[in-house]
Structure formats: C-alpha cells, structure tokens
UniProtKB/Swiss-Prot annotation:
Entry protein name: Trigger factor
Keywords: Cell cycle, Cell division, Chaperone, Cytoplasm, Isomerase, Rotamase
Known function: Involved in protein export. Acts as a chaperone by maintaining the newly synthesized protein in an open conformation. Functions as a peptidyl-prolyl cis-trans isomerase.
UniProt lineage: Bacteria, Bacillati, Bacillota, Bacilli, Lactobacillales
Domain PPIase FKBP-type residue range list: 163-248
C-alpha cells in the first residue's frame, strides 16, 4: 500500500491510498461468494455457476462495488494509521481509479483533530456558588417533600383551586371540527401542573363537580401538530370530581411512615441532616471540579475547531436521548407531539452543550498527553472491575464491550482531571 496526505486547510486534507491486487482478489472472491447462491446459468445447478462463466457473462466489474465495500474499511484505517493522522469525522471517499489487473487508488477527504495550545491548568483559583453547609430549613424542606408525597387525594365539595385535581371528560374542536388527540374521558388533571397547553388549567379553577366548562385556548405557534399550531380551540369540559390533597400531621408517626428505621421526628431530622451533608459535600466537590476544568478549558486555545466534531457530538447526544425515550415506550413522533417541539429544536437544545463537551475533551486529552499519562495493567484491571460493579455485569462482559485502547484513554483522562482538580483552590 502506498499512502500520501495533502493538507488543504487547517485540520483538513486529502488522503490518497492504494489497495493491492492481492487484497482486491480476496475481496472479489468474497463478493462473488455472497451472490453465488442466487446465480443461474445453463448447464449448471443454481448456485454453482463457475467464476469464469460469471466473468464472461456479466463481467468482473459488476463485483467491484461490493468488493470495495468489503476491502475499504480496513484499507482506509491502515492508511490513517500509516500516516499517523488523528481523524475525527467520517471521511468522504472517492474512487481515483479501479482498473482491472491494477491496484485501486482511492482518496479520502478527512477532518483531523485540532491543535490545542494549553494555558494554565495547575494551581487554578476558582469561585463556586455551592456550599457544604446544611441549614435547618434544608432538613425541614426535605421532610416536607416526603410529607407531600404521602398526601392522599380526597373528594372536595367546593370549588377547584390551584393544586387540586379534577377528573374530567373533554372534547376539543377547531372551527367546530373535532381533531385527533383532542378527546379524553375520566382524565385526572392537577391544576397548575402545566400538563395541558397554557390557559387550559386556569379556566377550570373555581369549577365544581357536575359543572360543564367551555375552555378556550390557542395552540402555541411551535406546537408539534402543524395543523393545530397557532389555532384557536374550544374544549367542552365536564367536571366529574374535584379532589384535594390531605397531608398527614408532622409528628413521630409521620417520621415512622417516611422511614421505618427511625422512631421519632427528631431521629428523622438527624438522619436527613447527615444525608444532606454528604450530598452537599459531593455537590461542592463537583462544583469545584467543574469550575477548575472550565477555567483550564478557557485558558487553552483550540485552533480552528472543526464544526463536524460538534455535529457528531450533537447527533450522538440526540440518538442517545431518543434511544432512552424508545426504551420507555415513547417513539420520536410521540415525544415531539407531547412536548410540542421538533427535531431541529432538539438538535439546538444539545448544540451548546456539545460545543462545551467537545472543547473540554480536547483540552483534557491534551493535558493527558502533555503530562505523559498512561494506564498500567493493574489500573486497566481495576477500571474493568469498577465498571463491572457499577453496571452490575461480569468483568468479562465489560472486557468484551470496551477495547484496551478505550480503557487506556479513559484512565489517562481521569488522571488529567485529577491534576486539574487536586491542585485547584477556592477563592
């Protein structure tokens, strides 16, 4: 294989590489064997057409595309490795020449990892808003949240107020015509929860069981269902029940209901204070780490960050998010309808965070390289065991999912973060 690289612009260039006849022949054989079972030829059983007959009848060139798909990934990776390039996005592949009996020549437009010029990243002085202190109010607020969680809904005779739950039937229409998804029976709606479009819940405040209420609203311009976006709608709503929350008394019995390991309200307060102090300390340490890393990134200069890196990170984040939604039984279409957002909105939502994450990773990688951090065999083994414990899976399964290079990279990154944070101080 011969390879060359022509620089076209900062972090951009073209790789030209060849594929040998030996590798081409193997790829052509694989391509032929893949389709052989479906081939017919006079005098031969189906799937037994000899290669020379195929070449004479169809021409070997018809196999070139499949053969290229077979041989290209390995050839491209070998070219990148030989040239010592750090490619960060999918290449644009073009065929330069594919002549019978000769080496194939291809080109790949690539984007390479940008240069990072490090600034100060040790002994940084940072400011954080977080505090390790836990007040009595913090403890009381945690108990109050648990108290509210134990509240029961009871039937209310009077008018519905904010925070009450109404059980309703509703039928929606636009210009007198009902629309899909605009109808519901015995639906429990907490007033003030924001479950329905703006203005709907407010118009049910003051209603009583048995009332029929005409609710008039306008769908937001950004509503997912384009045929409803910006349109005025009317919902004929029947109130079946009004329910209000009944919260338990703040006493020792409540404390035991919240946590069976305590006997009194005072015991619960002591326990919650310890839990909150531990959580606050973790949050404080995380805030210091985040501020120190952010300052280290700000002190560095990334030379012409390729936009492709941001796009790939956005796509990765969006795909991960939508995958989580689908595992919960929510399709992309359902998600966008429920939230009144679009695919573009979701991409925009992740763009700023993607930009920050890419820059942070580049700077931390540069620090790891500057410090000469590497992972030892024992550190790799410890990382595997830690991941196995964290995700409750066998260590061998972790080994099969993560390559040694990935583990070495992650360990080096952790060491770089430790250098930043362990030397930082708070102003």
């Amino acid at each position: 294989m011969s390879t060359s690289f022509e620089n076209k612009a900062t972090n951009r260039g073209v790789i030209t590489f060849t594929i040998s006849q030996d590798k081409i022949k193997l790829a052509l054989d694989k391509a032929f064997n893949k389709i052989k079972k479906d081939l017919n030829a006079p005098g031969f059983r189906k799937g037994h057409m000899p290669r020379p007959v195929f070449n004479q009848k169809f021409g070997e060139e018809v196999l070139y595309e499949d053969a290229l798909n077979i041989v290209l990934p390995e050839a491209y990776e070998a070219a990148v490795t030989e040239l010592g390039l750090d490619v960060v996005a999918q290449p644009k592949i073009d065929v330069v020449s594919m002549e019978k009996g000769k080496e194939w020549t291809l080109s790949a437009e690539v984007v390479t990892k940008p240069e990072v010029k490090l600034g100060d990243y040790k002994n940084l002085v940072v400011e954080v808003d977080a505090s390790k202190e836990v007040s009595d109010e913090d403890v009381d607020a945690k108990i109050e949240r648990e108290r509210q969680n134990l509240a029961e809904l009871i039937i209310k005779d009077g008018e519905a107020a904010q925070g009450d739950t109404v059980v309703i039937d509703f039928v929606g229409s636009v210009d007198g015509v009902e629309f899909d998804g605009g109808k519901g029976d015995n639906f429990s709606l907490e007033l003030g929860s924001g479950q329905f479009i703006p203005g709907f819940e407010d118009q049910l405040v003051g209603a009583k069981a048995g009332d029929e209420v005409e609710v008039n609203v306008t769908f937001p311009e950004s509503y997912q269902a384009e045929d409803l976006a910006g349109k005025a709608a009317k919902f004929m709503t029947t109130i079946h029940e009004v329910k209000t929350k009944e919260v338990p008394e703040l006493d020792d019995e409540l404390a035991k209901d919240i946590d069976e390991d305590v006997d009194t309200l005072e015991d619960l307060k002591v326990k919650y204070r310890k839990e909150l102090e531990a959580a606050q300390e973790t949050a404080y340490d995380d805030a210091v780490e985040g501020a120190a890393i952010e300052l280290a990134v700000a002190n560095a200069e990334i030379v012409d960050l390729p936009e492709e890196m941001i796009h790939e990170e956005v796509n990765r984040s969006v795909n991960e998010f939508m995958g989580n939604m689908q595992r919960q039984g929510i399709s992309p279409e359902m998600y966008f309808q429920l939230t009144g957002t679009t695919q573009e909105d979701l991409h925009n939502q992740y763009s700023a965070e993607a930009d920050k994450r890419v820059k942070t990773n580049l700077v931390i990688e540069a620090i790891a390289k500057a410090e000469g951090f590497e992972a030892t065999d024992s550190e790799i083994e410890q990382e595997i065991n830690d991941l196995a414990t964290e995700y409750n899976m066998p260590a061998d399964q972790v080994r099969s999912l993560l390559s040694a290079d990935m583990l070495k990279h992650d360990i080096a990154m952790k060491k770089a973060v430790e250098v930043i944070t362990s030397t930082a101080s708070v102003k």
